[in-house]
């Protein structure tokens, strides 16, 4: 029931679907006259990038301040989370390299459909890698001086800043449907439905990567490291995985994840909470895979050769930028612009992915929840 006089809020998922359909219709009716709507779509990316840089900084620092992780358990959790993320990125990059886009789509035509140059290009460029290094150094310093009055005051200030930035990002995310409408109107107005095969290929690429990561890599970890039956694990994990797919958030799925780990999988409460509560700031395999795939995909669309060093940088940025953003709305979308821009790829490509991001966001959440549960089982094996 809703209070009298108040209309029920339309779910964001439904808003995004309606915006996609409405944008396609508007573009087909307006034709080239809808091109100006692409500028509005890129303005959304500009604002998101401006918020994302300080958000990543304070999120990493806050993780150091608030996380309580015993060293013995950290020696298992941290390397395992890093290994999972690297494997996820490697799968994404491998699939992206194996995909001959030019066979399916007229890439030269699509490059002309990207929204115009970003206003953010006229702002001072920020090196995300140095932002992350500064955040790590600040977090380590606060952790080393924990208990002192200045450290406590600064820690509280960081927590307050994180809450404010998350609220601002939440406000910006509410206008995602408008950005989706704008980019769909521009693209369909300029090329009809030529963009849809490209988006379909991208969705299949990411979905295939996540399926390989979950069904093959996690199965290997369960069988040979955690000494658990993968078939039984995935049967027990059905509830939290379906919940994550439905709500699109690993954090919102946390109560179901914990209940499944402790009651159905018989994982100890300590291991379950360490992996699913503390580890939720680290286990972002879905986001890492998505962003690595997106970066290589954009590079192919724009015919930009990414050398090995740049690909390693993509992986590093995706992993480090995801630390501490578990509770941020549309976390993968928030950090995507930073990763894309961090390796010199055109930010104009980001709005082109917006029409399918709502769908992939649910796959990201499901992969992240699976990661939490696999890590919990491995931790319990070495308890």
Could you describe each region identified by the protein language model?
Residues 47, 82, 86-90, 207, ...:
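Hydrophobic transmembrane alpha-helical segments of multi-pass transport and channel proteins
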Residues 239-322, 376-377:
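Helix-loop-helix junctions within the multi-pass membrane cores of secondary transporters/permeases
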Residues 38-46, 156-171, 232-243, 259-266, ...:
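Short amphipathic alpha-helical coupling elements at transmembrane boundaries
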Residues 71-77, 167-171, 264-280, 308-310, ...:
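Membrane-interface alpha-helices at helix entry/exit sites of multi-pass transporters
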Residues 292-383:
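Transmembrane alpha-helical segments and their short flanking loops
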Residues 7-28, 45-48, 72-231:
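Signature of multi-pass transmembrane helix bundles
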Residues 1-60, 66:
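Anchoring transmembrane alpha helix of integral membrane proteins
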Residues 77-88, 200-217, 236-243, 312-325, ...:
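Small-residue-enriched core segments of transmembrane alpha-helices in multipass membrane transport
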């Amino acid at each position: 029931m809703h209070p009298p006089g108040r209309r029920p809020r339309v779910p964001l998922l439904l808003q995004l679907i309606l915006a996609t359909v409405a944008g396609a219709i508007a573009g087909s009716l307006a034709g080239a006259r809808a091109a100006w709507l692409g500028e509005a779509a890129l303005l959304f990316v500009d604002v998101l990038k401006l918020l994302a840089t300080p958000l990543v900084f304070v999120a990493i620092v806050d993780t150091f301040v608030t996380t309580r992780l015993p060293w013995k358990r950290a020696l298992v959790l941290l390397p395992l989370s890093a290994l999972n993320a690297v494997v996820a990125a490697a799968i994404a990059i491998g699939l992206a390299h194996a995909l001959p886009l030019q066979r399916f789509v007229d890439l030269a035509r699509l490059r002309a459909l990207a929204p115009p140059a970003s206003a953010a290009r006229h702002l001072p460029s920020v090196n995300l890698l140095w932002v992350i290094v500064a955040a790590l150094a600040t977090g380590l310093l606060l952790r080393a001086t924990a208990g002192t009055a200045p450290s406590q005051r600064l820690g509280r200030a960081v927590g307050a800043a994180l809450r404010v930035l998350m609220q601002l990002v939440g406000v910006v995310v509410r206008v995602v449907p408008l950005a989706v409408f704008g980019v769909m109107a521009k693209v369909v107005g300029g090329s009809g439905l030529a963009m849809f095969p490209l988006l379909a290929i991208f969705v299949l690429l990411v979905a295939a990567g996540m399926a390989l990561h979950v069904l093959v890599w996690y199965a290997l970890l369960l069988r040979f490291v955690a000494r658990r039956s993968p078939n039984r694990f995935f049967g027990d994990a059905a509830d939290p995985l379906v919940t994550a797919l439905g709500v699109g958030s690993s954090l919102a799925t946390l109560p179901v994840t914990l209940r499944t780990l402790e009651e159905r999988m018989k994982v100890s409460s300590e291991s379950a909470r360490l992996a699913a509560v503390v580890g939720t700031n680290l286990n972002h395999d879905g986001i890492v895979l998505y962003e690595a795939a997106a970066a290589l995909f954009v590079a192919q669309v724009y015919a930009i050769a990414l050398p090995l060093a740049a690909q390693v940088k993509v992986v590093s940025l995706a992993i480090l930028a995801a630390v501490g953003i578990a509770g941020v709305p549309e976390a993968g979308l928030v950090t995507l612009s930073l990763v894309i821009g961090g390796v010199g790829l055109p930010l104009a490509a980001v709005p082109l992915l917006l029409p399918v991001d709502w769908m992939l966001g649910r796959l990201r959440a499901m992969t992240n929840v699976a990661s939490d549960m696999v890590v919990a089982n491995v931790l319990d094996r070495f308890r």
